[in-house]
Amino acid sequence: MGAAVDSLLHQRRPAGIVIVISDFLLNRTDYEDALSRLLAARHQVKVIHVLGEIESTGGYPPGLYRVRDAETGELRETVFGPEAAAACRRKVEQLAAAVRGFCTARGIAYAQAFGAGTLDTFIERELPALGVVR
């Protein structure tokens, strides 16, 4: 996200509306810094927080998984079951609350689009609320 913001800011465009679409699965300081730099450049920032249905609900089928840590690249094996699903949902709720809280405190419009099943609702309610469509 930081590199994308750097690229935009180096173009020396006049301030305008910037819509950031991200899963925000990165270090909190990274997205906070990127969004803060957009605000400092006087852009009107709007955030669309996206996650897939399975990721946002912890709806993975139970079983053994081999996963790669996005930060370290390390491969690990993990067993996914009801406890892991609940932990996944808690993490998603915490992440969404952190991003929403950061945005709200700084006047950044925030919309959550988790799962394809919510697409119609998102288009009908959230995009107008963001001021993207009428």
PLM regions and their residue ranges:
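Generic enzyme active-site microenvironment
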Residues: V20-I21
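Von Willebrand factor type A / integrin I
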Residues: S7-G16, R28-R134
